[in-house]
Regions:
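N-terminal secretory signal peptides that target proteins for export/translocation
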Residues: 1-7
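An N-terminally biased module of ancient metal coordination in phosphate/nucleic-acid-related enzymes
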Residues: 25-102, 122
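Hydrophobic faces of well-ordered beta-strands that scaffold small-molecule active sites
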Residues: 48-52, 72-75, 103-107, 138-140, ...
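Acidic-and-aromatic substrate-binding clefts and catalytic sites of carbohydrate-active enzymes
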Residues: 51-59, 78-88, 112-121, 148, ...
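A general structural detector for well-ordered alpha-helical segments in enzyme core domains, enriched
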Residues: 61-64, 91-95, 122-130, 162-166, ...
Length: 376
């Protein structure tokens, strides 16, 4: 390791830089228009939606994504409402082949038969198949901690020793683990105390995940504590804590998580509304959070699309949501949300920060995932 340069060396470097600047002529300060994007720039800026779930042929969806300037990371999930994992994998591989440089995907594994001695080998085979076909990450879902039970009836947590070979492999091979553990804190609150209407709607439609009605199930704190123990045991693991790390109700909590785990990033998928809710009350706090952690936040929408590809209205709604997110981050417009009462303003982030959130952080985390020449 080389020693840090001394004061004299630093002075010489600074003097040389100053001389170069003078020789080139003093550059005029960037205009406000050059430092910020506008709403109209949306379709002209290269972006990555690093959290979608796309099934089937998805030709309409991909046409809209391309028109809107998006590359995508489609994430396979062990979710009963989605197609079987093998079918999800085939759809993701097909998309990647049909849209080279535009689509990347993350694999997952089934927890079916988890209590069986044969489970570990089956999970390994699923992951091997995904990696062989180009997967750039692995997703673990909220069923771990909220649904999966062991042979004795206890809930299986993310730090269970049987996951250790998988996590250790990802850490060793520098493969990203995407983790959705727990749910919004609203999940543990009565309906009348929930902050946003979309959470009320989701938990009415999915009562099996509405933890307020299931006090016998693990608490929000217990699930996240198990996740954090897993991360402490694997300090070199690259971890994408999706959905603002399930700490969406307070950006200070998200900040503390990022400070504790320097190899973790977060995405905003399906949690932008919680940032908007906080911005309606303290916009500068939310803006400061995004500015401070600009290198560790990824844009994601959590769009689920397909396998039906016949409804143009569905694609139009996705475009509208993408555009609304862009408006919130890049403009200072006065806005309203269907999810809560009251107005809020866009955060008007500098374009350098917007580029990181919308593209550069995903490229850095997932390497050459969207390289059209990347081999399987």
């Amino acid at each position: 390791m080389k020693a840090a340069p001394g004061r004299t060396a630093r002075f010489c470097v600074l003097l040389a830089l100053a001389q170069c600047a003078c020789a080139a002529g003093a550059a005029a300060p960037a205009s406000p228009a050059a430092r910020f994007y506008a709403l109209e720039d949306f379709g002209h800026v290269d972006k990555i939606d690093a959290h979608v779930h796309v099934h089937g042929s998805a030709e309409r969806f991909m046409a809209q994504a391309i028109a809107d300037g998006f590359r995508i990371l489609t994430i396979n999930v062990d979710y009963p409402d989605f197609p079987p994992i093998g079918e999800q994998q085939r759809a993701a591989v097909s998309l990647r082949q049909r849209y080279p440089g535009r689509v990347a995907f993350a694999e997952t594994f089934s927890v079916e038969g988890f209590a069986s001695p044969a489970w570990s080998a089956a999970a390994r085979r699923q992951l091997d198949s995904g990696f062989a076909q180009g997967a750039v990450g692995v997703k673990i879902w909220k069923n771990i901690g909220m649904a999966l039970r062991d042979a004795d009836g206890s809930y299986v947590m993310p730090d269970d020793a049987r996951f250790e070979p998988i996590i250790a492999r990802l850490e060793r091979d520098h493969i990203v683990l995407l983790g959705h553990q727990a749910e919004p804190l609203n999940c543990w609150l009565p309906f009348e105390k929930m902050t946003v209407r979309s959470d009320r709607a989701y938990f009415r439609e999915h009562p099996q995940y509405y933890m307020y009605r299931h006090p016998e199930m693990p608490t929000h704190e217990a699930i996240l504590a198990a996740r954090d123990r897993m991360l402490r045991a694997h300090p070199a693991l690259r971890f994408d804590a999706v959905h603002l790390a399930s700490l969406e109700w307070d950006v200070d909590r998200v900040a503390a998580f990022l400070d504790r785990f320097p190899n973790a990033d977060v995405d905003v998928a399906a949690r932008m509304v919680h940032l908007e809710y906080q911005a309606a009350r303290d916009p500068q706090k939310v803006r400061r959070f995004l500015m401070r952690y600009q290198d560790r936040i990824l844009y994601g929408s959590d769009v689920s699309y397909g396998p039906d590809d016949s409804d143009p209205a569905e694609v139009a709604a996705i475009h509208s949501d993408w555009l609304a997110d862009w408006r919130f981050l890049v403009t200072a417009d006065r806005m309203h949300s269907e999810d809560f009462d009251g107005a809020f303003r866009g955060l008007h982030l500098p374009r350098t920060v917007v580029d990181k959130i919308y593209r550069r952080n995903a490229e850095g985390l997932f390497g050459g995932a969207w390289d059209a020449t990347r081999k399987q």
